[in-house]
UniProtKB/Swiss-Prot annotation:
Positions annotated to bind ATP: 10-17
Molecular function terms, GO-annotated: ATP binding; guanylate kinase activity
Keywords: ATP-binding, Cytoplasm, Kinase, Nucleotide-binding, Transferase
Organism: Dechloromonas aromatica (strain RCB)
Coiled coil: none
Record GO cellular component, one term: cytosol
Enzyme class per UniProt: transferase
UniProt domain Guanylate kinase-like: residue ranges: 3-181
Name the UniProt record assigns to this protein: Guanylate kinase
Catalysed conversion reaction: GMP + ATP = GDP + ADP
Localisation: Cytoplasm
EC number(s) stated in the UniProt entry for this protein: 2.7.4.8
Gene name in the database record: gmk
C-alpha cells in the first residue's frame, strides 16, 4: 500500500466533519473518501460532495455485490465506503481519509492493519450536549439517542492510534495535521514514495 489510509472517527457532535473539512483545505495531498448513505441530505448538503445519497434498497444491493470496504447502520441509517475507490487511490500512492464510525473503523483495520486510526473527543459531555442542541436540526429524542450512542462510541477510543480532544478548534486542527504529516514521514511511507532513492542509498 503506497498511500496512507487515515480512519477518523468520533461521536456525533465532536466536530469531526468540521475538522476534516479544514484539514482537506490545508493538506491537498489527502483525499476524502465520500461515503454512501441512506440518510436524507441536511440543508446545504449536495449529492456526491458530502455523501452519495442512495435509497435503502440500492444500498442493500451494493452490500450483496460486496462493493463496500465497510458498512454500518448508525442512528437508523446505513453508511458505507467504496472498496474499489479506496484500493485504486492507495495503489496510486495517494493518501485517503475515511470519516466513519468506530464500527466501520474496525472493519477497515481488519482488511488494512496499517491504517492509521484517529479518534476525535469532545472536551466534556456538557459541551457535546451544547453542540448537538445548537445544531437545531434534531428533536430532543434524537439528541438523547445521540448522546447515549456517543458514550458507547467513546468506550472504543483505545482502539485508535491517536486521540485528539476538540476543545479549541485551531489546536485540534494543528494536532490532526501533525498526525497526517508525521505519518507521511514514516519509514514505510518514505520508502514507497522514494523507492529508487532507497535502492541507491541503502
Amino acid at each position: 500500500m503506497a498511500g496512507n489510509l487515515f480512519v477518523v472517527a468520533a461521536p456525533s457532535g465532536a466536530g469531526k466533519t468540521t475538522l476534516v473539512r479544514m484539514l482537506l483545505e490545508q493538506e491537498s495531498s489527502v483525499n476524502l473518501s465520500i461515503s454512501y448513505t441512506t440518510r436524507h441530505p441536511r440543508p446545504g448538503e449536495q449529492n456526491g460532495r458530502e455523501y452519495h445519497f442512495v435509497e435503502t434498497p440500492e444500498f442493500r444491493a451494493m452490500i450483496a455485490r460486496q462493493e463496500f470496504l465497510e458498512w454500518a447502520e448508525v442512528h437508523g441509517n446505513f453508511y458505507g465506503t467504496s472498496k474499489k475507490w479506496i484500493a485504486d487511490q492507495l495503489a496510486a500512492g495517494r493518501d485517503v481519509l475515511l470519516e466513519i464510525d468506530w464500527q466501520g473503523a474496525q472493519q477497515v483495520r481488519a482488511l488494512f492493519p496499517q491504517a492509521i486510526g484517529v479518534f476525535i473527543l469532545p472536551p466534556s459531555m456538557e459541551e457535546l450536549t451544547r453542540r448537538l442542541t445548537g445544531r437545531g436540526t434534531d428533536s430532543p429524542d434524537v439528541i438523547d439517542r445521540r448522546l447515549a450512542a456517543a458514550q458507547a462510541e467513546m468506550r472504543h477510543v483505545g482502539e485508535f492510534d491517536y486521540v485528539i480532544i476538540n476543545d479549541q478548534l485551531a489546536q485540534a486542527l494543528d494536532d490532526l495535521r501533525a498526525v497526517v504529516r508525521a505519518s507521511g514521514l514514516s519509514f514505510g511511507a518514505q520508502r514507497a514514495r522514494h523507492a529508487a532513492l532507497f535502492e541507491r542509498m541503502i
